[in-house]
């Protein structure tokens, strides 16, 4: 991987964001996702690389494009594995709510954990708390540690939690400690990464979300130097989701074993979920969010706001791009 490839990866998420943003607020989440998928795949196809989707839109028979195992790119050049979510927060995009974005993680071949389409208990925290907070601890213990690491009182801390029934007790415990809870309906990738930057106002992400997005978050936090841990959730009684209404704990364990995951209770660190020598995260806003603005359509241009975090040069680059339309007469600053 090199800087030229990273620039092209940025353009991949920009094009996906623009495609989805054209459908923002129309209540068409599936169409917004499909538009992002098509745009992302089209731009990936122009990159000189031997790319492979390791986390994508589903299995080969479930998704027409960006399915798990699909080869992308020109077929020559460096080997790159991708974990992609072309429209993270499809409901947010459909309803014109904050936090939707096009995201991906990239690494050298074999550098990303091939997470199953399961749930994952996650803990994300700032670099100052790396290796000090622990997902094995109670929320109360972690808040005390986080308070010490950041030099803030517990009542000055804000914890992001997915607004789900399964988090009722977690939210009660956090608030019982005096910390603030910021519930989100979707989009925990951006919430996890935001914990890595001071001044945003969120200090920790706790709770259960999708496992594939956990890998993308882990890649970003590893490159940023933040804390991230994840543990797969296979018990429907814990996940408490209608998607698993017909699933059993035993059946899920069997599925994991068939995928080669035998240590089903393993706690994964960021450098295990994103283990490659070179790791890159790229995200571009579809709607406004914690980290960057959404796509803005103007008469003569389209503006995107994006973030690229890379281990290659230990940088986090916030990028505002003006995509100039044909025949443009005037571009404002």
Curated annotation (Swiss-Prot):
| GO terms classed as biological process | fructose 1,6-bisphosphate metabolic process; gluconeogenesis; glycerol metabolic process; reductive pentose-phosphate cycle
List, separated by semicolons, the cofactors it needs: Mn(2+)
Query: What keywords are assigned to this protein?
Result: Calvin cycle, Carbohydrate metabolism, Hydrolase, Manganese, Metal-binding
A single MF term (Gene Ontology):
sedoheptulose-bisphosphatase activity
Q: Which residues bind Mn(2+) 1?
A: 33, 57
Q: In which pathway does it act?
A: Carbohydrate biosynthesis; Calvin cycle
EC number in record: 3.1.3.11, 3.1.3.37
Q: Which residues bind Mn(2+) 2?
A: 85, 88, 213
Q: What class of enzyme is it?
A: hydrolase
> Catalysed reaction per UniProt?
beta-D-fructose 1,6-bisphosphate + H2O = beta-D-fructose 6-phosphate + phosphate; D-sedoheptulose 1,7-bisphosphate + H2O = D-sedoheptulose 7-phosphate + phosphate
Name the residues that bind substrate: 88-90, 119, 164-166, 186-188
Transmembrane domains' residue ranges: none
Q: GO CC annotations?
A: cytosol
Tell me the function of this protein. Catalyzes the hydrolysis of fructose 1,6-bisphosphate (Fru 1,6-P2) and sedoheptulose 1,7-bisphosphate (Sed 1,7-P2) to fructose 6-phosphate and sedoheptulose 7-phosphate, respectively.
Q: Which PANTHER family match?
A: FRUCTOSE-1,6-BISPHOSPHATASE 1 CLASS 2-RELATED, FRUCTOSE-1,6-BISPHOSPHATASE CLASS 2
Q: Which family does it belong to?
A: Belongs to the FBPase class 2 family.
Description of how the protein assembles with itself and partners = Homotetramer.
- Spell out the protein name for this chain: D-fructose 1,6-bisphosphatase class 2/sedoheptulose 1,7-bisphosphatase
């Amino acid at each position: 991987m090199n800087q030229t490839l990273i620039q092209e990866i940025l353009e991949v998420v920009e094009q996906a964001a623009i495609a989805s943003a054209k459908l923002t607020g129309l209540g068409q989440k599936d169409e917004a996702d499909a538009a992002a998928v098509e745009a992302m795949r089209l731009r990936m196809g122009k990159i000189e690389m031997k790319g492979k989707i390791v986390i994508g839109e589903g299995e080969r028979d479930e998704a027409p494009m960006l399915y798990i195992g699909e080869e992308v790119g020109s077929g020559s050049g460096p080997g790159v594995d991708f974990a992609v979510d072309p429209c993270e927060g499809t409901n947010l995009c459909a309803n014109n709510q904050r936090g939707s974005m096009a995201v991906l993680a990239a690494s050298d071949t074999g550098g990303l954990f091939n997470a199953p389409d399961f749930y994952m208990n996650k803990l994300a925290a700032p670099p100052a708390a790396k290796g000090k907070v622990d997902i094995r601890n109670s929320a109360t213990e972690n808040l005390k540690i986080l308070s010490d690491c950041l030099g803030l009182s517990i009542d000055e801390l804000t914890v992001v939690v997915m607004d789900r029934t399964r988090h009722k007790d977690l939210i009660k415990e956090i608030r019982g400690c005096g910390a603030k809870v910021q519930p989100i309906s979707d989009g925990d990738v951006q919430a996890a990464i935001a914990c890595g930057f001071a001044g945003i106002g969120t200090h920790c992400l706790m709770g259960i979300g999708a496992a594939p997005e956990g890998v993308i978050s882990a890649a970003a936090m590893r490159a940023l130097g933040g804390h991230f841990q994840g543990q797969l959730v296979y018990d429907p009684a814990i996940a408490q989701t209608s998607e698993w209404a017909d699933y059993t704990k035993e059946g899920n364990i069997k599925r994991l074993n068939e995928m080669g995951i035998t240590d089903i209770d393993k706690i994964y660190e960021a450098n295990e979920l994103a283990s490659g020598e070179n790791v890159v995260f790229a995200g571009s806003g579809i709607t406004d969010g914690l980290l960057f603005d959404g796509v803005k359509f103007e008469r003569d241009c389209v503006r995107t706001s994006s973030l690229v975090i890379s281990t290659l040069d230990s940088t986090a680059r916030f990028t505002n791009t003006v995509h100039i339309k044909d025949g443009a007469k005037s571009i404002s600053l």
